[in-house]
A protein has these predicted regions:
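Domain-edge interaction signal
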Residues: 1-193
Length: 193
């Protein structure tokens, strides 16, 4: 079985430099796809319900303090990372195909509208630290259900209007800079990813 570090390094090899928020979410959704299709996780590490969405503590420890990272950043010692099997790569490749063009904040908002993250954060305020684990059972149960409107789990990976609306709803033009509209994405309180 792959580790989350193996998956993260593969994502970075395929994408180049990405935000750590985006990396966390792509790893989360790759694992969710494996759970839905095989009833097994892609890797043994778990995710916690942090302020800005699901975060693997093991992966966070590797990129802590950095906003953008690239290939070789997660495991500078190549012996730490093992190549993924073709089967394991298929989950990551499909996740990247459907969600790879999204920014980290868009993926964060997507996860906020989904039960695994929001249920795990029950009892926590919007900006409270939360270390509650998002269970694999909750992940598989939600993403395999009809309630899920995540484009990765819809036939053909097509966006529907509810997802499009949710991803763009929080964007607003608040001012102009040098005569051009300045688009502002609301800041999420807290320092967590």
């Amino acid at each position: 079985m792959a580790s989350i570090l193996d998956v993260a390094e593969y994502i970075l090899e395929k994408t180049g430099y990405v935000s750590t928020m985006k990396l966390q979410k792509l790893a989360f959704y790759s694992n969710a796809l494996s759970l839905v299709e095989t009833h097994r996780p892609l890797f043994p590490e778990t995710f916690q319900a942090w302020v800005n969405g699901p975060v693997s503590l093991e992966l966070y420890r590797r990129h802590r303090g950095r906003l953008i990272i690239g290939s070789g950043s997660i495991a500078p010692n190549p012996k730490i990372v093992q190549p993924l099997s073709a089967h394991e790569r298929s989950f990551v490749d499909r996740t990247l195909h459907v969600l790879g063009d999204y920014e980290g904040d868009q993926l964060s908002r997507l996860s906020h509208g989904e039960a695994p993250w929001s249920d795990a954060r029950q009892g926590c305020g919007d900006s409270d630290r939360c270390s509650a684990v998002i269970s694999n059972e909750a992940i598989e149960g939600f993403y395999a259900s009809r309630r899920c409107d995540n484009p990765l789990f819809l036939g053909g990976g097509e966006l529907n209007s509810r997802v499009t609306e949710r991803l763009s709803a929080k964007r607003s033009i608040t001012s102009h800079v040098d005569g051009l509209p300045c688009v502002r994405w609301p800041a999420v309180c807290g320092s967590q990813i």
